[in-house]
Amino acid sequence: MSSCKTTLSEMVGSVTKDRGTINVKARTRSSNVTFKPPVTHDMVRSLFDPTLKKSLLEKCIALAIISNFFICYWVFQRFGLQFTKYFFLVQYLFWRIAYNLGIGLVLHYQSHYETLTNCAKTHAIFSKIPHNKDANSNFSTNSNSFSEKFWNFIRKFCQYEIRSKMPKEYDLFAYPEEINVWLIFRQFVDLILMQDFVTYIIYVYLSIPYSWVQIFNWRSLLGVILILFNIWVKLDAHRVVKDYAWYWGDFFFLEESELIFDGVFNISPHPMYSIGYLGYYGLSLICNDYKVLLVSVFGHYSQFLFLKYVENPHIERTYGDGIDSDSQMNSRIDDLISKENCDYSRPLINMGLSFNNFNKLRFTDYFTIGTVAALMLGTIMNARFINLNHLFITVFVTKLVSWLFISTILYKQSQSKWFTRLFLENGYTQVYSYEQWQFIYNYYLVLTYTLMIIYTGLQIWSNFSNINNSQLIFGLILVALQTWCDKETRLAISDFGWFYGDFFLSNYISTRKLTSQGIYRYLNHPEAVLGVVGVWGTVLMTNFAVTNIILAVLWTLTNFILVKFIETPHVNKIYGKTKRVSGVGKTLLGLKPLRQVSDIVNRIENIIIKSLIDESKNSNGGAELLPKNYQDNKEWNILIQEAMDSVATRLSPYCELKIENEQIETNFVLPTPVTLNWKMPIELYNGDDWIGLYKVIDTRADREKTRVGSGGHWSATSKDSYMNHGLRHKESVTEIKATEKYVQGKVTFDTSLLYFENGIYEFRYHSGNSHKVLLISTPFEISLPVLNTTTPELFEKDLTEFLTKVNVLKDGKFRPLGNKFFGMDSLKQLIKNSIGVELSSEYMRRVNGDAHVISHRAWDIKQTLDSLA
């Protein structure tokens, strides 16, 4: 393999010499072939730079982009302004959906199954194929089949496209399919992204007011600033990530170069999708049209959906989640509190319009939610009789008094542990005092923000005719931004940090280090900056009402004082007075001639390099075991039926489906695997045959066709079949060999395929990619083990060993993601089966699935019940 890699690198070395001193290497995701990627250019240069070679598609794309302006002029002259606006709005929506849904689906399947790459390999699109039929491929250039003619055309066209745009030194046959597929994929990305941008710009241009008075104002100035900032973000992002990340290169192959993240990547997470769309809002400000703003919000929101469902899953699967042990300190403290205090439960937290961690047995939760419901209901029923001036005073006084109360508690707690001492002196515990503080702080936030929402809503209702729709939408955007900031803050510092846990439980802190995870990577005190933007959003929504400005100033000042004079001194006392430079600060410092590379960037860089996937190339040897005449799906059903009818007696000696040692063992106690031996006549065998595991009570007397789903409890009979169904259904194949008369193999169903329910089961051998049953095994029993419950230590030992074998134990905690068939209900049944005690799912989630806590808690409950008996 190493010699192949060296040869390939030498063959493509001449193409990459233009990179100068940058020695960039890459490797394919699955086959692990190393190569040097060719020189590529950004979208604008590729399409419009006359000094660069242009392919046919690039010429067509450039022509299509330019034609939009001529079409706009013609439609405007023929049908008028309004029709032209909606005409290009529809076009923009089409291209935006093509971007986020179309490209999203393509990248999703490429990420999971390498669909585009496998398609290119299957149809030999980038291979040298002679004019006669290739002995190792179904591809034939002389065939009269429409499908083969189609793929022959695709092959020639794709090769022509690459040759016409790449330098003469570029030998497409020397490169792996991944890089060639990526180069073709870029062409369609260019078309969609450029059309998306141009149609949006034309729609915005047609929406700009004609009056100079409406254009030259503070909104236009702010809009131009946002547009210029947006341009810088895009340019700086491309400077950092280059074409490789710009065109989603890691969905196709992985570069092994050192990644440098600076500039705009220190300002915001995913800058190309977050602050990289501020230009949308700048153009909306210039137009002063709420319809343009709504279209911009739609485009931006759809981009976030693309990020959430396409890019983020791929990044986590490829590079890992990027979370180190230090950044999880607060989360571990929360786990430790739950572990050491059985009566402790996670506090109720208000996030936006939802409540998290509601406990139906905790009265304070009902009191908090009841307060919100009573205030809202009272407002709705008495809206006409509420005096806004009195309500303003109520909101102002409530905020000020409650903030003074909260600040006093935190200040005295920091100085002398006053709040904790108060409870300890009255017979309560330290954790109990912390729980009461959690209720007080959350109630303070809920009460003040509920009153603010009520007051703002009544303000808008009473002056709705004077409210600008664009201002209303921008205000809601700021509210959404604050909600996002709160969620990101809580995600980064966990419940312990959100509720100022280091004021009350500093003895639980093992590492004196502030987190730099999540939003804290970019801002030192996000709650002081973004934590009040939603309140200023209410100022916009109420058309700059004086009372709302006063409330916004009050919120800002109280927030600033709390952070500056109470929180910061306490943090310095606990963690040490260290100056931490935020990502934004590093970027500002980086504008100087000497750029500074942050520690955070180095950590991300190391994680990315260490997490590069090194998958071995899938073997193709299994498919060669069988004659190709038996792989024709079109004649397969007829072949099976004829064979079953005419030669059943002759073939019966070669039909076998037996469980190993079934004469000795008919009851398999989990996690013991079940090994199955099968034999099938060569005339009946199909590479897509598969074996499913079923409950006997579900299949019943239907012996010819299985009418219930396998639910994932199935295995292929050959490792070369079902390529798009993951490795789990092929790794179970441990043996397969073929003779002139029959094919036989061995399949092992381990804990990744077995049921975790007591019952009687059977295996069914199915023909091809169907549910037609050819063979049925002898019924057998699967049962959960009975763990040793003599002592809590032995019970814990057996439980952890079992969960480890089932692959659902990580760091001593139950993690059902490791085995989709062993969930919370299975764990409950295992414990009940062993010790006779049933723990609730809610409790096990509350202790974060800690095996030590769960086993000892179950054993303690058993002892208590025995003593009561």
UniProtKB/Swiss-Prot annotation:
Name the residues that span the membrane.
56-76, 87-107, 188-208, 213-233, 259-279, 292-310, 363-383, 391-411, 440-460, 464-484, 535-555
Q: Could you state a single Gene Ontology molecular function term?
A: phosphatidylethanolamine N-methyltransferase activity
Gene3D superfamilies the UniProt entry points to? 1.20.120.1630, 2.60.40.2840
| Residues with the N-acetylserine modification | S2
Cytoplasmic topological intervals: 77-86, 209-212, 280-291, 384-390, 461-463, 556-869
For biological process, the GO terms are: methylation; phosphatidylcholine biosynthetic process
Per the record, what ranges lie on the membrane's Lumenal side? Answer: 2-55, 108-187, 234-258, 311-362, 412-439, 485-534
Which reaction does this chain catalyze?
Answer: a 1,2-diacyl-sn-glycero-3-phosphoethanolamine + S-adenosyl-L-methionine = a 1,2-diacyl-sn-glycero-3-phospho-N-methylethanolamine + S-adenosyl-L-homocysteine + H(+)
Cell compartment(s), UniProt: Endoplasmic reticulum membrane
Q: What is its EC number?
A: 2.1.1.17
Keyword Lipid metabolism appears in the UniProt entry: yes
Task: Identify its membrane topology class.
Answer: Multi-pass membrane protein
Q: What is its main location?
A: endoplasmic reticulum
**Pathway per the UniProt entry:** Phospholipid metabolism; phosphatidylcholine biosynthesis
**Keyword list, A-Z:** Acetylation, Endoplasmic reticulum, Lipid biosynthesis, Lipid metabolism, Membrane, Methyltransferase, Phospholipid biosynthesis, Phospholipid metabolism, S-adenosyl-L-methionine, Transferase, Transmembrane, Transmembrane helix
Gene Ontology terms, cellular component aspect? Answer: endoplasmic reticulum membrane
Q: Which family does it belong to?
A: Belongs to the class VI-like SAM-binding methyltransferase superfamily. CHO2 family.
What job does this protein perform? Answer: Catalyzes the first step of the methylation pathway of phosphatidylcholine biosynthesis, the SAM-dependent methylation of phosphatidylethanolamine (PE) to phosphatidylmonomethylethanolamine (PMME).
Q: What is this protein called?
A: Phosphatidylethanolamine N-methyltransferase
